[in-house]
Amino acid sequence: MPGWRLLTQVGAQVLGRLGDGLGAALGPGNRTHIWLFVRGLHGKSGTWWDEHLSEENVPFIKQLVSDEDKAQLASKLCPLKDEPWPIHPWEPGSFRVGLIALKLGMMPLWTKDGQKHVVTLLQVQDCHVLKYTSKENCNGKMATLSVGGKTVSRFRKATSILEFYRELGLPPKQTVKIFNITDNAAIKPGTPLYAAHFRPGQYVDVTAKTIGKGFQGVMKRWGFKGQPATHGQTKTHRRPGAVATGDIGRVWPGTKMPGKMGNIYRTEYGLKVWRINTKHNIIYVNGSVPGHKNCLVKVKDSKLPAYKDLGKNLPFPTYFPDGDEEELPEDLYDENVCQPGAPSITFA
């Protein structure tokens, strides 16, 4: 924001010339103290890291920070070697933590009986557990785990946020989500989460913010039929018509009317996982999910009653690549999926 920076520079020069009040407290003519004072007033905003850097030094600093972020992520790849928390077995009624994934797009997929299904690709990028909160410090019912997804640049993050991630030994994340868990599903902060946390054949719930459509009428927003195009109709073709009766003398709350459409959080329940790619951490879920491409979505085990008992066959509390389990193949498929390399026609 060059306008804000120019205004701050002018204000610093004016305050630096003052001989009493704030200018005397900070030292007359001392612009460095003035800048520190102004930055202290805006501690929640991004840092001006490139203020005293030349154009040649900016790429060097960015590369240096990028290498440091990669080293921090590599140090967290083996959480079981660094004094892990005790791992408890699965019990009926247990709730695991979820993931934060990036929506890549959609593609077709075929089953062995020839049916075509459209799936959405969700990629897990640098997803880590950030904080554990016991149920005594939460709502008294369930514990929570804070999970961060997708590493972002630290140059535009506030100092207080950077301090939180520095204590964890992780680079800052783009978004943080909270998941309710049971006590036996607690995971140590700093543990990475992978797409193998889920398995093909299970069902998940996906939450994301829908695409904003702006202010829309009732035909687009609610699917109203509209009114006749001819036969004396004037300027009412796409209008809702009557919104109430004359007896009540008011409009009932919740009546479908024009308004802002989209840009709200929605959840798709009971989406089947058809395929898992362990190399690129991609989850193939059935159907569409809310949000645009490259948006971050929240994925967790389905809470529908029909799928609650499927958790006993899943990695609990999560998948550890350095655990006792055998190494997973690059692709995991549901038993009904026709694999890309399999023949399309077979003869009995």
Curated annotation (Swiss-Prot):
Annotated compartments: Mitochondrion
Oligomeric and partner information: Component of the mitochondrial large ribosomal subunit (mt-LSU). Mature mammalian 55S mitochondrial ribosomes consist of a small (28S) and a large (39S) subunit. The 28S small subunit contains a 12S ribosomal RNA (12S mt-rRNA) and 30 different proteins. The 39S large subunit contains a 16S rRNA (16S mt-rRNA), a copy of mitochondrial valine transfer RNA (mt-tRNA(Val)), which plays an integral structural role, and 52 different proteins.
InterPro entries linked to this entry: Ribosomal_uL3, Ribosomal_uL3_bac/org-type, Ribosomal_uL3_CS, Transl_B-barrel_sf
Species of the source: Homo sapiens
Homology family: Belongs to the universal ribosomal protein uL3 family.
Stretch forming the transit peptide: 1-40
Gene3D superfamilies named among the record's database cross-references: Translation factors
Disease: Combined oxidative phosphorylation deficiency 9: A mitochondrial disease characterized by failure to thrive, poor feeding, hypertrophic cardiomyopathy, hepatomegaly, and psychomotor retardation. Death in infancy has been observed in some cases.
Record-linked PROSITE patterns: RIBOSOMAL_L3 (PS00474)
Domain of life: Eukaryota
Molecular function via GO: RNA binding; structural constituent of ribosome
Any Pfam family the entry gives: Ribosomal_L3
Name of this protein: Large ribosomal subunit protein uL3m
Keywords: Disease variant, Mitochondrion, Primary mitochondrial disease, Ribonucleoprotein, Ribosomal protein, Transit peptide
GO BP term (any one): translation
GO cellular component: mitochondrial inner membrane; mitochondrial large ribosomal subunit; mitochondrion
